[in-house]
Amino acid sequence: MRKLVLLLAAALALTACTAAPEVSSPAEAAPPAETAAIGEAAAAFPVGTLQMSIPQVMDTGTASVEITFTGLETEPILKLDYAAGVQTKLCDIDLSRQIPVAIMQHGDTVEYFWDSEGSTVFAHTAIRPDGSVEEQTIPEKFYPNFYDEYAAYDIWGTACTRLDWQTGELTTASLPFVQLDSVLGAVGSRVLLTRIVSDTPLPQGEGNEEMLDAVLQNSLREYDLYDPATNTIEKVFDEPYYPEDRNEIKSYLGYCGDKLYFGVTCTDGASALSRKNTLVSYDRTAGTWQEECSAEGEDVCGFWPFSLDGQLKLVVLWRTKDTLTLYSIDNGARYEVPYEEAQSSGADATGNKNFPVALTEDGRILVTDGYVYRNGVAASRYALIDLGAYLAGSREYTAVEMWTE
């Protein structure tokens, strides 16, 4: 079963890097993006600003919604209103029969998608602003990974399946290509994905690993923008499926304007520990790569991207035990911010302070501020602070009123 991982509440434990090809250097710039779209246009429907969804948390810029996990069969869905600085309970969910798939929002309604009974039952629960809750089953497998104000979308494998918020209608279109490799994120009203371009179809099944590897050695990984409204793709760039330097790994972090941002990590081949992190961007209009910022050290480290209204704004480039290195997309400046690393997660948990969690529409940033305990399990306590003050090293927080039973 395909599941997306928690990106927000577990930020302290994440390393956002995944193995991928090497990025071309600025001197070896790729050609500008092709403008020709591939695929047969389907009947168009409205598509807004797409957001990628994950199983346990959602952020809108004005609020965040998350599922807590304390080991009980019944757990709450909590909403944190940034303007009020208060976290409240929306409803309880039954984890004894529900496996979280995604949380998303349209208008003022929060939608919680889940499956059950060995992935044979698929459903979503609508949580209305008046507090009412409505559970609706879905007639076929549906694991949505994107949403906008009009619909939820399951884009994977060979198809794009769309669930209309107003009508509840489920429609499916075959993707206009084969050999989907990965789905990376939303870029406005389109989805950035990669597909494998090879001279021969990829060998399938057990026992064909060597043959598959041989085909991939001579294949390309092509980055495309997929438009779910018209069921077409536009090529952005391609590169060898396997990088020349196997000790480099790359992860897509987000977009801002015409630029796509990637984090590139150089690792120690023996220990796989990161030695240097570099933030690079690809300009879709010019077709050129640019190195934005880099940092190096001796600690294990990944990238943590933070977006607002869908666009990348801030990146944690490096993390030591007591200092974060951040890079601002807006002004190109680099900042060193103190923080306290999380220590343990039980009753004796300490630290977990001043790590960024989310950006808010009113110019603040949500950060960790120690712990709150629910059913004896430690969960992050939050606080809010002006973004400029945070980057300057201030800790003049406004504490969030956390929900507890």
Which role fits each region the language model picked out?
Residues G39, A44-F45, L72-D94, S116-I138, ...:
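Surface-exposed loop/turn elements that mediate protein-protein interactions on large endomembrane-trafficking
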